[in-house]
Amino acid sequence: MPAFKTLDDLTDIAGKRVLLRVDLNVPVSGGKVTDATRIERVAPTIKELSAKGAKVILLAHFGRPKGEPVADMSLSQIISAVEEVLDQAVAFGEDCVGEPAERAVAALNNGDILLLENTRFHKGEEKNDADFTAELAKNGDIYVNDAFSAAHRAHASTEGLAHILPAYAGRTMQAELEALEKGLGKPTHPVVAIVGGAKVSSKIDLLMNLVKKVDALVIGGGMANTFIAAQGIDVGKSLCEHDLAATAKQIMIEAETAGCTIVLPVDGVVAREFKANAANETVSVSAIPADAMMLDVGPKSVAVVNDWITKAATLVWNGPLGAFEIPPFDTATVSAAKHAAERSKAGKLVSVAGGGDTVSALNHAGVVDDFSYVSTAGGAFLEWMEGKELPGVAVLTRPA
C-alpha cells in the first residue's frame, strides 16, 4: 500500500481549522444513542487534535436523507453523546456549509470542537459535487479522514476534500489500514480466511478474490449449503441457493488453480425448527434428513476449522459459521472464535475480522478485544476484502 500521511505528520497546528470526517452514524432510539462504539472509535483523533490546539470541525452523515434536511436525521440529537464520550463541550453548526457553518467556525477558539450538520442534507455530498466540496473546504485549512467505514464512497466529505486541502489519515483510519495490510495486503503466510453468512450471492466477488490470496478458505453458514449441494449432495430444507451451483463450482475450480484449499463442513447440526433450543441432531453432511435444515457446522467440522486456525499465521474472518443468534447453533462460531482469540493473545496469530454479523458473533463469544483487529466498517471492509479500490483511501495515498 502506498504511504499515507497521519497525525504524526501534522505539527504546529495550533489555531488551524481541521475538517475532520468521522463516522457518527450511530443507532438512536427515543432520542438516545443506544450504541456509542463509533463515537468511541474516533474519540482519540478528536482529542489529539484538540489537545494540539487545532479548531476541530467534525463532518459526518447520519442516515439517508436524500439530499435535503430531515428533522429526525439531524446530528443535533447526538451532541450530548459525543460530549459524554469526549468529556468535553461540543458546539453545533446548523448547516455544514454557508453562513451558519462559517459563523460557527469563526466563533471557535483553539482546541474547541464543533459538529456541523449532516453533510447528506445536501445533494452535492453524495454526488461529490465540486461546488459543494469547495463550500465545505472554505471552513478548513487541513483535512483529516477518520471514517474508514465511509471510505468506499466517493462523496464530497470522504473523497472530494482531499483534492483541495492537505489530507491526512486519522488514528482510526490509520489503525484500520495498517491492520488490513497485515490481513491481506502483505500478510504472513499461511493465511486462512473464514467466510460465513447466509448467501453466496452477496459474497461472490469476495470469494473469487480470496481464493487467489489465501492458503485456505473455510466456508460456513448458510452459504456452505450451496457449495455442498453443488457437489450433488441433498441438503434437505437447509438454506441453499441451488441456482448458484455453477458459481460455487467455478469458485472451487479457481481455488484449485490458485492452490487454495477450500474447507467445507463434513458434519452439521440439523433441526426441523428454526428456534432456540429446537430438537437437533448431528449428522454427516451426506445424511441430512429431507425434512431438516443444517443450522450449524458439527464438531468434526469445528475440529478441522480449529486445526486450520492453529496452522495459520494470519486469519481474516467475515461471517459466522452457523445461526449464532439462536442457541445451541452458536457452538461452532464460539469455539472457532475462542480458539482464534487464544492464538492471537499468545502472539501466534494476526487475526482481522469485520462485517456487522461478524462483530456481533465475536461479541457473543466474548472475544472482540482479543482479536488483533476488529473492523466496524461493514461495506468498506467487504469491498476491501473483494480487492476493490476504496476512493476515500486511494485519495489519501496518491502522490502529493
From Swiss-Prot:
Localization (cell): Cytoplasm
GO cellular component: cytosol
Coiled coil: none
Top-level EC class as recorded in UniProt: transferase
InterPro entries reported in the protein's UniProt record: Phosphoglycerate_kinase, Phosphoglycerate_kinase_CS, Phosphoglycerate_kinase_N, Phosphoglycerate_kinase_sf
Keyword vocabulary terms for this entry: ATP-binding, Cytoplasm, Glycolysis, Kinase, Nucleotide-binding, Transferase
Keyword Iron in annotation: no
Keyword Cell cycle set for record: no
Molecular-function GO terms, alphabetical: ADP binding; ATP binding; phosphoglycerate kinase activity
Assigned EC number: 2.7.2.3
Amino-acid positions noted as binding substrate in the UniProt annotation, renumbered to this chain: D23, L24, N25, R38, H61, F62, G63, R64, R120, R153
Protein origin, superkingdom: Bacteria
Record GO biological process: gluconeogenesis; glycolytic process
Binding annotation for ATP: K203, E325, G355, G356, D357, T358
Pathway(s) served: Carbohydrate degradation; glycolysis; pyruvate from D-glyceraldehyde 3-phosphate: step 2/5
Complex and partners: Monomer.
Family in the record: Belongs to the phosphoglycerate kinase family.
Protein name listed in UniProt: Phosphoglycerate kinase
Gene behind the chain: pgk
